[in-house]
Design a protein with these regions (language model features):
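Residues that define the loop-to-transmembrane-helix transition and helix capping
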Residues: 34-35, 97, 123, 193-194, ...
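Alpha-helical transmembrane segments
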Residues: 75, 120-136, 191-203
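Hydrophobic/small/kink-forming positions within alpha-helical transmembrane segments
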Residues: 18, 49, 77-81, 107-112, ...
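Loop-to-transmembrane alpha-helix entry segments
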Residues: 62, 66, 103, 110, ...
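Membrane-interface interhelical linkers
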Residues: 1-16, 21-35, 39-74, 84-94, ...
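Alpha-helical transmembrane segments of compact multi-pass small-molecule transporters, enriched
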Residues: 43-47, 102-116, 131, 202-206, ...
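Selected transmembrane alpha-helices and immediately adjacent juxtamembrane segments
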Residues: 158-188, 193
């Protein structure tokens, strides 16, 4: 079992991100996604600092080397600030379905980046597992119920006629892939929670700069007064940038980046049960088939 720590951590990351996506979606509808991003990172900063202080005696990762700080901070800026900004804007321009479909490119991009930056190479069985898993994920995304506009169904092909939206989604996928690879390069055996802390700090500073340029601070202050939204952000921050990102770094620390990224991409599949149970959504046969295919691909990583 020890040899699969990375793969297990990758799956744990996907479960955490499934939970956080539901809470952040609800909060984002109330206070906006940009405010959610800034506040969640601030909350994660204090959560991570508290954990670091309890078991390492340091609230801030002051024992990190210059190498750790440089690459992990860069990872936080690329992954959290740039990647998330582009992805959330893509949600607005072309919708969540097309954005998540483009985001399925993140694992192969992470594998390629891992090969270029870290010299990682995937075995044929791992490549096959990645292809099968991502095929299943894309089947699930493509077959999710389409939201209607003015009583008419929006065709998927119509959403692909927006090159700006596609570029934004592709930029988000690239940011997340490269951010993950940079985090692995930056850790080099350093503590996972402390590494996550550095990434979160860099991401938070990046968003602070963005808010200054966009002059959106008044919306943050309004958001902080929304008790219902703050509950969602708090729970989402716990499962997302606190637990989820920590698990993601644990994953890349113990397995290849491409494999870890593929397992983390299971969110569209894992969200099916809560969507049915809590939101009473209907699923179709193709979604079920896609989910089964995805898990068959995951199984190949454990052979």
């Amino acid at each position: 079992m020890e040899q699969y720590y990375g793969e297990i951590a990758g799956i744990a990351t996907a479960f955490c991100w499934t939970a956080t996506s539901m809470f952040f979606e609800a909060a984002g509808k109330r206070i906006g996604s940009l405010s959610v991003n800034l506040i969640r990172l601030l909350m994660a900063f204090f959560l991570l600092g508290t954990v670091n202080w309890l078991y390492r005696g340091l609230f801030l990762p002051l024992d990190a080397s210059v190498h750790n700080w440089l690459w992990l901070a860069l990872s936080g800026l690329v992954g959290f600030t740039i990647g998330d900004l582009l992805l959330f804007q893509a949600f607005v321009v072309v919708g969540a379905r097309v954005s998540m479909l483009i985001m399925a490119l993140s694992p192969p991009m992470a594998a390629i980046s891992g090969w270029i930056i870290l010299g990682e190479t995937l075995e044929y069985s791992a490549i096959l597992g990645m292809v099968i898993t991502l095929t299943g994920i894309m089947m699930v995304v493509l077959n999710r119920p389409v939201k209607t506009k003015n009583g008419k169904k929006t065709k998927l092909k119509d959403w692909f006629n927006n090159p700006l939206g596609l570029l934004l989604a592709f930029g988000g996928a690239t940011g997340q892939a490269i951010g993950l690879v940079l985090s692995k390069k930056g850790m080099e055996g350093y503590d996972v929670v402390a590494s996550t802390h550095i990434r979160v700090m860099a991401g938070f500073i990046g968003f602070v700069i963005v808010f200054f340029f966009m002059k959106r601070w008044h919306k943050v202050f309004i958001a902080l007064k929304n008790k219902q939204a703050m509950k969602g952000v708090t729970i989402g921050a716990f499962f997302g940038p606190f637990l989820g990102v920590s698990f993601s770094l644990l994953a890349v620390q113990h397995t290849l980046t491409g494999i870890a990224s593929t397992l983390m991409a299971l969110v569209p599949v894992l969200i099916i049960p809560p969507a049915v149970i809590f939101f009473k959504e209907k699923i179709n046969v193709m979604e079920i088939i896609g989910a089964v295919i995805a898990f068959v691909g995951v199984g190949l990583f454990f052979l």
